[in-house]
Amino acid sequence: MSLIQRLISSDKYSLKCPYSMTPKGICIHNTANDATASNEISYMQSNASSTSFHIAVDDNEAIQGLPLNRNAWHAGDGEIGEGNRYYIGVEICYSKSGGEKFLKAEDNAASLIADIL
């Protein structure tokens, strides 16, 4: 699966990804909604919340919104926790309704993660 880069502007690093990092692994989440990867990335990049993640994957595409050498606020373990500081955050789309789109998004995420590792 190819990864589309649509990286956040560096002026938002202080809010969304303030620390450089060397990733130790990948932390996978479900979005708990039915938005596309493009919509997930757009919302994450444009809102005023620090909550962030690196990649969103849906049934058609995978989009990277943050540099993989910067942290993201996705794991809920604060500023010093390893989840946020050392793991790439991947969001799988369409988890609210499930079904074929969600299953394809899971397959796409597995393929992408295998490529990253």
Predicted segments, located by residue:
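Active-site-adjacent loop/helix surface patches within enzyme catalytic domains
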Residues: 1-117
